[in-house]
Amino acid sequence: MGTAAEALNNIDGTPCKEFYVADIERQGEQAMLWDILQEADEDRYVCTMSIDSNARSNEDTIKEFGLCDFHSYTLMQSVSVKLHPNGKKRRYLLQLRNPWGKKEWLGPWSDYSKTWETYPYVHE
């Protein structure tokens, strides 16, 4: 089984990079990951994301939130939002598309999540 990066490269020669969040977190470089995603989004790169097939320890959480393992999602946009108009606290949100269209994110910040009501300023 290959990766989305390998598929894109095989189809049209698109240069691809792969990043593993677990590796970045171990290095304490979470801000670097956000910078990479922002730059890729701004430059209109094709970005895909997937859940590591070795994430068995998180299998229940994956299913609870409506995600699929062994499956690629497309990054539609990445945004950094303030939780309150005058506050400094931010959240980094990713809008992903499931090409299958059969399952949907059910966790915080999902389409019908109460989180939007808790932080109405973000929706604006």
Task: Give the location of each predicted region.
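Accessory/interaction modules and long regulatory regions
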Residues: M1-E124
